[in-house]
Regions:
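Hydrophobic alpha-helical segments embedded in the membrane of multi-pass proteins
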Residues: 1, 16-26, 43-47, 78, ...
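Hydrophobic, membrane-embedded alpha-helices of multi-pass small-molecule transporters
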Residues: 1, 129-133, 151-152, 167, ...
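Juxtamembrane interface elements at the cytosolic ends of transmembrane helices
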Residues: 1-4, 135-140, 151, 163, ...
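N-terminal signal-anchor module of multipass membrane proteins
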Residues: 1-37, 45-63
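Juxtamembrane helix-boundary/capping and inter-helix hinge elements in multi-pass membrane proteins
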Residues: 9-12, 34, 53-64, 88, ...
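Membrane-embedded helical hairpins/re-entrant loop segments and their flanking transmembrane helices
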Residues: 11-29, 201-234
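Short, non-helical or kinked segments that cap or interrupt transmembrane helices
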Residues: 12-18, 34-47, 95-104, 148-155
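Membrane-embedded alpha-helical modules
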Residues: 65-174
């Protein structure tokens, strides 16, 4: 859901986002030696930064400022690389002392609260589909067995999409009119101090979210991915 919705809200290309999400996930599994069952998608956490640097203009992408927002996200990626090197050099325990659960927990909660208005706004468009998604996720998360318990979000998306299709809420004409093969739009990044300072610090929040996600995945699979393959690899 986020992988599609984030580019729509920011004015980026959905197809390019899906391509980069796939390539990023493959690179992630290469770096983690295929040990961590995770998919890398878009992050809602950067929406605030994007909105501040490149707000939509009458529902259309801000083509003038969007390259600066992309430049800020690029710099946020550099923060990930620096933190990975610090964790590798000083060890997980030394670095994690500065990020105890009392710090990481509220940050993750804050990110969730930031996303709440967007979720409610989307639910208002069709409460039936929204309730089907929520009910499916809750049912499989609580009573699911084996693999079904691990992928409740995917099952919720599949169930709600099926219901939406049966209700005629999905317009397939746009997909039918598109070509099967095409090149992604090429856009060069631009860098500005204000856009970098606005977006780059968000990387600290998403890193806390990442640590929580890796810990949650480890709890589900009963493995310690912080130790093996190591937090710096993830």
């Amino acid at each position: 859901g986020a992988t599609i919705l984030v580019p729509i809200l920011t004015g980026l290309s959905v197809s390019t986002t899906l391509l980069m999400a796939g390539l990023g996930t493959l690179l992630f599994h290469f770096l983690t030696k295929g040990k961590v069952p995770a998919f890398l998608g878009s992050s809602f956490a950067f929406l605030g930064g994007y909105g501040a640097v490149a707000p939509m203009v009458n529902g259309a992408p801000n083509k003038e400022m969007l390259p600066y927002a992309c430049g800020g996200v690029f710099c946020a990626g550099l923060v990930y690389i620096v933190m990975s090197a610090l964790i590798k050099g000083f060890g997980v325990k030394r670095v994690m002392r500065f990020f105890p659960p009392v710090v990481t927990g509220p940050i993750i909660i804050a990110i969730g609260l930031i996303l709440a208005p967007s979720a409610i706004a989307n639910c208002k468009t069709n409460w039936v589909v929204a309730l089907v998604a929520v009910a499916t996720i809750i049912i499989f998360n609580i009573w699911g067995k084996g693999m079904l318990k691990i992928i409740p979000i995917i099952l919720g998306v599949a169930a709600s999409y099926t219901v939406a299709a049966c209700m005629g809420e999905i317009d397939f004409s746009a997909a039918a009119s598109r070509s099967w093969i095409g090149l992604p739009p090429i856009q060069m990044m631009k860098f500005d101090v204000s856009s970098i300072l606005t977006i780059m610090p968000i990387a600290l929040a998403t890193m806390m979210e990442h640590i929580g996600d890796i810990t949650a995945i480890g709890a589900t699979t009963k493995r310690n991915y912080i130790a093996d393959p190591g937090l710096h690899r993830t």
